[in-house]
A protein has these predicted regions:
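Contiguous beta-strand/loop segments that form the cofactor/metal-binding neighborhood of enzyme cores
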Residues: 61-62, 72-75, 80, 84-282, ...
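Conserved phosphate-coordination/catalytic loops
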Residues: 1, 5, 28-31, 134-137, ...
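Beta-strand-loop-alpha-helix segment that lines the small-molecule cofactor/substrate pocket
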Residues: 3-4, 8-56, 71
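Short, hinge-like loop/turn segments at secondary-structure boundaries
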Residues: 40-43, 66-69, 96-98
Length: 340
């Protein structure tokens, strides 16, 4: 429940204190933080579930099993993942004194100090990784889970602030990231302007196979066969009769309530059995780091080749220096080596 730049310190402190965790995505704001969180969880024997609850969404589990695992898409060579919601902050509020109830120095914490203004923290790269860190991780993690994928071999990206240049937000309003798995490309795109190509899928994933296409989101899925066969549509499964409190729970997104319940139950079962949950911290580390590497690739303007064993970009010291954000004193960046 904290901004992204606090996740690593909070998570590691909690694990050091003996706690198992539910940790929101992205698990960190830089790559080395992800590596340190994973190392700490393994060394300390903690169960850590990440808030990538598509892994627990009933209709997405069905889509994975029915169409991908059964081979009905054939050879999948391209997956498009996307978010076309106009979610980038558009305002330009003045810098003001922080509210009296807010300790602004503590809020900023290890991030670079900046003046307070009334705008969402996700609008600022000092505290986040923008829309890529917020939304691409959901879609990339879903695709990796549905297809059983680990790390990509290469990551490239381009984008920037192309349309809304007046806002104080310093996150991209347009960006494409390609995650290259040799014979498979996963391509992310976001635009915080214009219309989505498919209004029914403004946020989701489209799997292209040589035998069919699958569109999937938290609201539905659609399977479109190539040639013979009938298309299949499935909407999200609500559980309002079984859980009538969903109708009145404040701020609850009803369409994700079934997934949240299953995700929490999965975590509790993993804690009881001391096993790995469906969205284990290692999966969260991979999905988080990949998205951060996408932003680094865009910043440097070149493709990054990743070595997962070393947690390093191959042959690119400039990129490797960007895997770790400098911490503002007195906070100290967590070190993976401490938990080796």
């Amino acid at each position: 429940a904290t901004p992204d730049h606090w996740h690593a310190l909070n998570a590691i402190d909690a694990m050091e204190a003996g706690a198992d965790l539910y940790l929101q995505k992205p698990i960190s704001v830089d790559v080395v933080e992800s590596q340190a969180i994973l190392a700490a969880a393994r060394k300390l024997g903690r169960v850590v579930q990440i808030g990538t609850q598509r892994r627990s969404t009933p209709h997405l589990v069905e889509a994975r099993d029915r169409f991908i695992r059964e081979g009905k898409l054939g050879k999948i060579a391209l997956v498009e993942i996307y978010c076309y919601y106009h979610m980038r902050f558009r305002g330009n509020p003045p810098d003001v004194d922080p509210p009296k109830h807010l300790d602004w120095d503590m809020y900023v914490g290890p991030a670079p100090m900046r003046p307070y203004c009334d705008m969402p923290w996700r609008a600022l790269m000092e505290f986040s990784n923008g829309i890529v860190g917020d939304m691409c991780i959901h879609m990339l993690d879903m695709v990796r889970w549905m297809m059983g994928l680990g790390w990509p071999k290469r990551i490239s990206s381009s984008g920037g602030i192309f349309v809304d240049k007046q806002s104080k937000a310093n996150t991209s309003d347009t960006q494409t990231v390609t995650f290259d798995y040799d014979d498979l490309a996963i391509v992310w795109q976001h635009r915080s302007w214009g219309a989505p190509p498919d209004p029914k899928y403004p946020w989701g994933a489209t799997f292209y196979g040589d035998r069919g296409t699958l569109k999937a989101s938290v609201m539905s899925y659609d399977f479109i066969p190539q040639g013979k066969g009938e298309p299949v549509h499935k909407d999200v499964e609500y559980e309002l009769e079984q859980y009538p409190e969903d109708k009145t729970e404040p701020r609850l997104e009803r369409h994700v309530a079934p997934a949240i319940r299953r995700h929490m139950l999965d975590l509790l079962a993993a804690i009881e059995k001391r096993g790995r949950p469906v969205a284990d911290v290692e999966e969260g580390a991979i999905s988080t780091a990949c998205c951060i590497l996408g932003n680094i690739a865009a910043q440097l303007g070149r493709t990054l080749t990743w070595d997962p064993a070393k947690w390093q970009v191959v042959g690119d010291e400039e990129a490797n220096r960007l895997l770790r954000r400098p911490y503002r004193q007195p906070w100290v960046h967590p070190e993976p080596a401490k938990y080796a």
